[in-house]
């Protein structure tokens, strides 16, 4: 599980020094939790193959990443082409999102579906949304409909929905509770995810 050291990594200056620590400290945690999330998805959707990806940030040549993530998708490559699950970390929190970023192929179809859903009835009120995967800001669930409409109108718009865990909770005492909450987050998002995969 993540520790306080995981969050301190984002204070390290320089691309290579930070990436070295991300590879040694954060990516093994992604793999550990990711396998448990993969198992959950495989149990809930047994007829679908899922693949686990870890962001490598290979296109970066100068600036160190301000966050990093892993993803679960039905695609062997190109997970951003479709709605997918992300487990990631910023300097202040860890997140699990159902993500539609970087102009997925069915962006307009996703938007049409999402604007028709009453997410407040499907998800608990502690869920949040993100409108840009490159920024740490999150918004309450009440902002979902507007963001979903924007996803259909603005080509470069994005939408992620899920839960965040503030860094203060990662003190080893709550590890099993947090893991259970992560799995439960996937379970709550599954009905929305399955509808998205049908469009």
UniProtKB/Swiss-Prot annotation:
InterPro entries: UPF0637, UPF0637_domain_sf. SUPFAM superfamilies: YktB/PF0168-like. Pfam families: DUF1054. HAMAP family: UPF0637. Belongs to the UPF0637 family. This is UPF0637 protein YsbB. It comes from Lactococcus lactis subsp. lactis (strain IL1403) (Streptococcus lactis). The gene is ysbB.
């Amino acid at each position: 599980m993540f520790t306080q050291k995981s969050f301190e990594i984002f204070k390290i200056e320089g691309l290579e020094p930070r990436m070295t620590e991300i590879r040694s400290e954060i990516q093994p945690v992604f793999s550990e939790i990711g396998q448990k999330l993969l198992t959950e998805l495989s149990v809930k959707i047994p007829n679908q193959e899922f693949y686990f990806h870890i962001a490598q940030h290979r296109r970066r040549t100068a600036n160190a990443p301000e966050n990093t993530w892993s993803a679960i998708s039905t695609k062997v490559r190109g997970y951003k082409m479709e709605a997918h699950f992300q487990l990631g970390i910023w300097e202040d929190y860890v997140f699990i999102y159902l993500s539609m970023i970087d102009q997925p192929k069915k962006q307009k179809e996703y938007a049409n579906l999402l604007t028709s859903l009453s997410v407040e009835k499907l998800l608990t009120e502690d869920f949040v949304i993100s409108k840009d995967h490159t920024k740490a800001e999150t918004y309450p669930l009440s902002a979902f409909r507007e963001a979903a409409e924007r996803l259909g109108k603005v080509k470069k718009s994005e939408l992620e929905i899920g839960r965040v865990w503030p860094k203060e909770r990662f003190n080893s005492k709550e590890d099993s509770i947090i893991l259970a909450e992560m799995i439960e987050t996937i379970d709550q998002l599954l009905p929305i995810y399955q509808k998205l995969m049908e469009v």
